[in-house]
Structure formats: C-alpha cells, structure tokens
Curated annotation (Swiss-Prot):
It holds the Pfam family MinE. The lineage of its organism: Bacteria, Bacillati, Cyanobacteriota, Cyanophyceae, Nostocales. This is Cell division topological specificity factor. The gene is minE. InterPro entries: MinE, MinE_sf. NCBIfam families: minE. It comes from Nostoc punctiforme (strain ATCC 29133 / PCC 73102).
Amino acid sequence: MIELLEKLFSRGPDSSRTQVKRRLQLVIAHDRADLDPQTLEKMRKEILDVVCRYVEIETEGLEFSLESNQRTTALIANLPIRRVKGAIPEWERGDK
C-alpha cells in the first residue's frame, strides 16, 4: 500500500530521513481522511481531466500530496502550467 501511495504522491530525490517523514505524514493523513488508494487515484485522474480542459500542464513537475494537521486533512495538487488553452466552447461553459 505504501508503494502505491509513494507512486501517487512521489516527489523529487531527498534524504532518507525526509522521505521517511513524508511517508509517515502521508500514512497519518491517509488514515485521517479515511480514503483508500483507489479513491485517491480516481480523484487524481478526475482533477487532472478537469484542469487539462483549461490549461496544458507539465507532467514532469506534477505532484499530489495529502497534508494533515490536528484539525484538517488537505489534498494538495502542484500542477505546473505550460500554457493556458484557448477560449472554452459555450457548450462546456453551460451558457444557453
């Protein structure tokens, strides 16, 4: 399970201590959020689908993580934007 979470929320190379700390924080946040890995992956894909309608993103710097403090758990998405796409068609905006 931790391997899947690491894959979903991987970051650049770091020291072992920092990686262990992040893993522990991720496990704690995961437990508090009560989300299974499949749900997190589905959320990640849906977020990317929506964002990609409006902007082109740099997949190399893409990062999703769960962060937790004493009161809340947050899903943090770092999505480097290459460029903003053109105008959004009326049918997608919901204009009538």
